[in-house]
């Protein structure tokens, strides 16, 4: 797994902690499962696309629960 992907995973877990307690477990597991799925990605363009989707989805979830 590339360093960029590991860093993105850490950032997502930090954001998960900002969610209401009942939903934290679900989104932490969701993030873990998706990052494991993409752990073999090596192509820089694919990694950029993945990180952009992660950012977009994370922002959407945070707006949804506020």
From Swiss-Prot:
Pfam families documented for this protein: Complex1_LYR
InterPro entries, alphabetized: Complex1_LYR_dom, Complex1_LYR_LYRM9
Similarity section: Belongs to the complex I LYR family. LYRM9 subfamily.
Protein's recorded name: LYR motif-containing protein PHYPADRAFT_186863
Biological source species: Physcomitrium patens (Spreading-leaved earth moss)
Lineage, opening ranks: Eukaryota, Viridiplantae, Streptophyta, Embryophyta, Bryophyta
């Amino acid at each position: 797994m590339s360093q960029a992907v590991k860093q993105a995973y850490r950032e997502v877990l930090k954001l998960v902690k900002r969610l209401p307690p009942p939903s934290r477990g679900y989104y932490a597991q969701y993030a873990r499962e998706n990052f494991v799925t993409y752990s073999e990605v090596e192509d820089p363009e694919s990694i950029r696309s993945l990180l952009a989707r992660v950012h977009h989805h994370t922002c959407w979830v945070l707006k949804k629960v506020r």
